[in-house]
Amino acid sequence: MMKGQHRTYRKISLPTLLVVLLMPFAWSADAQQQFISEGKIEYERKTNQHAFLDENNMWDEMAKKDLPKFVTYYQDLYFKGNRTLYRVGREPDQVQRKSWSVLDPDEVIASNLDSGSAISQKSFFMDTYLISDSIRRIDWKISPEIRKIAGFDCRKATGKVLDSIVVIAFYTDEIVTSGGPESFAGLPGMILGIAIPRMHTTWYATKLELVPVKESELTAPKKGKKYKGPEFRHDLHDLLKNWGDEAQKMVWQLEL
């Protein structure tokens, strides 16, 4: 510096200084955030079967004394990229004693999220059906509420299915596959929790396994009487239209 010249210093505000100092930590946090596109998720499906029973029916009231309040099953979701397969998981710890209106969750659902298509295998009345359909589109409303599920921070979303049934979902964007249990999909990440108050049923992930997923674990089922989705729903409603409220509950379960 030449004699007579003065160095000028730019004043830095405290907020600016804090931003500069914290930037390396922000980069580090971003680098550590994981984005998962392959693995296996276990869901616990729990139904309040006492709520399924008719309180005005003498036989149903008697059944409540003999049946446990909740029926619990486990189901697995294999996912890789934009393909998923949902199927029966491990056996519950105890034999599940249940009402006839609570169906066994023995379906297999293979979904291709890119094409928006799904193939489902469902059993009902000793018959097996193979149903080709499009993935249900739900007008999800996302809210700020966060819930921790299976170690992930999950954001809440609500929507409706089957015209009027409210669905509450919790999803994480750390798992980039936009699928979920049953045939639920369409959120910006994996759905780890579902609650359907009208069906008195919840699905919550219990764990994620970061394992390679084989092609055979994503292969769509092939056995069963072949149906298109609208055709299956029409025949199902026609079959059960005279069965009353109990039949409606079974229809909801089969159409998920």
What residues fall within each predicted segment?
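Bacterial Sec-dependent N-terminal signal peptides
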Residues: 1-36, 254-256
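Extended soluble regions of mature proteins
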Residues: 32-256
